[in-house]
Curated annotation (Swiss-Prot):
GO annotation, cellular component aspect: cytoplasm
The keyword Isomerase is annotated on this UniProt entry: no
Class of enzymatic activity (EC top level): transferase
E.C. number: 2.1.3.3
Keyword list, A-Z: Arginine metabolism, Cytoplasm, Transferase
Binding site for carbamoyl phosphate: 53-56, 80, 104, 131-134, 267-268, 295
Catalytic activity: carbamoyl phosphate + L-ornithine = L-citrulline + phosphate + H(+)
Name of protein: Ornithine carbamoyltransferase
Family under the similarity heading: Belongs to the aspartate/ornithine carbamoyltransferase superfamily. OTCase family.
Major location (coarse): cytoplasm
Top-level taxonomic group: Bacteria
MF GO annotations: amino acid binding; ornithine carbamoyltransferase activity
Gene it is expressed from: arcB
HAMAP family: OTCase (MF_01109)
Amino acid sequence: MTTVVKHFLRDDDLTPEQQAEVLELAARLKKAPFAERPLEGPRGVGVIFEKNSTRTRFSFEMGIAQLGGHAIVVDGRSTQLGREETLQDTGRVLSRYVDAVVWRTFGQKRLEAMASGADVPIVNALSDEFHPCQVLADLQTLAERKGSLKGLKLTYLGDGANNMAHSLMLGGVTAGVDVTIASPEGFAPLPWVVEAARARAADTGATITLTEDPQAAVVGADALVTDTWTSMGQENDGLDRVGPFRPFQINEALLAKAAADAVVLHCLPAHRGEEITDEVLDGPQSVVWDEAENRLHAQKALLVWLLAQRTGNRP
């Protein structure tokens, strides 16, 4: 039997049906954290951080332990990634040691290069272009609060070219969510990501809307999402990342224009008083803390599902 290696490098690596399977499994694992133990042994998962992390590190390390495994955690400075050998060769070598590799890195092409040589699943724990594990947690959180995801209206406010906006488009429309990206002029999503999202939306019946009007964007929205205006590595890019974004802040006045039962999400860390106010972040419509917890459950489900694709043992 030919071994199937499935990677999760961007949100549309999962079909709508596969994404639904992962989210269903995440809900089950939240209720029964030790129900699946595919890494019993323990078997190893490589966890590589070239960007600093709090939630990603804690949630993956704990999740791997709950699945019976051992996380081998290293930072970019203590490896030779892309320096002494090709990333393809690194993928080949790591595949002989571990059952999966979780990597938080810079450019998406680095992930693609490693995956091209790997015989085990490569998981994007964040890249400059995408943050797909976070969006799985976002979708799990929305499903808990709203039930069916199909037809929900989600509005993201902020830098449309950052990894959260991109992943919300791809992952959102995969789930049948109508996604609106509201961003200042000059900060729209990358065109090739928009094209990919619209291609997936055509399959699911969802919609993608791009706008520079935050007031119109939030009217009737079921969920508002934001992220920091300055992502890691953009601190010295020379762009004004404050003034143009002020109208896109999620505050009580803007939230009042959304649906009465709208929820607010933020991947964290939050810059209080910038992209979101204290009143909203700590308010009754915020689901941010559930969202953060769900990183643990969604990522566990993803690993279980990916490992099952290799073994044929359906979770």
